[in-house]
Amino acid sequence: MERTIGIDAGGTLTKIAYFNEKRLLTFEKFYSHEQHKIIDWIKNNNGIKQICITGGKSKLLQQLLTGSYKIIELNEFEATLAGVQYILKEEKHAIRNFILTNIGTGTSIHYVYNEQYIRAGGTGVGGGTIMGLSKLLTNIDHFEDVIPLTKVGSRKELDITVGDIYGGILSPIDNNLTASNFGKAAITESNNSSSDILATVQGLVGEVVTALSLQFAETKNIEHIIYIGSTLCNNVQLQHIISSYTEYQNKTPIFLQDGGNSGAIGALLHATK
């Protein structure tokens, strides 16, 4: 049986989407630098004839696959948006206008309206920031090891909050809001645990990404912000940081099941439509 797969070759992770024998949407995930594993997986799955590929690392991977398969290239955001629209329909979300924030190695933010889109902006702060600072500050360099520690860590000994500054005096904004990420590290002597450091790193990333998304949502008068990306996968703590901050600003956050695979899904759908 001839099969088609969609590949999103990102800066950190490469995601593959395909329909299995039961026509169920199925996913595989590899580190992008482990290209031999990606190629081996494709070669070991007999019947693959066509590959639609997108993402920043797509050219490099395409060079390794050319000649053996029919290759289709697809613009990265077109693939992502197609995947997001598919998931929205599957999850029965009736939303046409929204801010789409994709937290990958870095973060890109798009304004989507009536199935059209424009790039609103982005930031170099994203999943790559979490992993880079985790390595520098704690020498932990695997995402799977970082996430459990962020769940048990505390930001209280490292972040300065509005309440810390006002010291019990009535403040003009919520005392629990962060006034300075890692601000206490410069003014207190403390031997912080790895879990506290990682929780604070993730807090910084979550707040920066959310603040930018909120600014764009406010500018366009948009209620819904859809957050996707592999950085959110099984990352309940980061989702909580983003969700609480978004809701505090009276916007509605949406986290899609399999949102991190949107690019691969969109690539697959493009090749099989």
Swiss-Prot record:
SUPFAM superfamilies: Actin-like ATPase domain (SSF53067)
Localization annotation: Cytoplasm
Domain of life, source organism: Bacteria
Enzymatic class: transferase
Main location (coarse class): cytoplasm
Pathway the protein takes part in: Cofactor biosynthesis; coenzyme A biosynthesis; CoA from (R)-pantothenate: step 1/5
Subunit structure: Homodimer.
Cited function: Catalyzes the phosphorylation of pantothenate (Pan), the first step in CoA biosynthesis.
Protein name: Type II pantothenate kinase
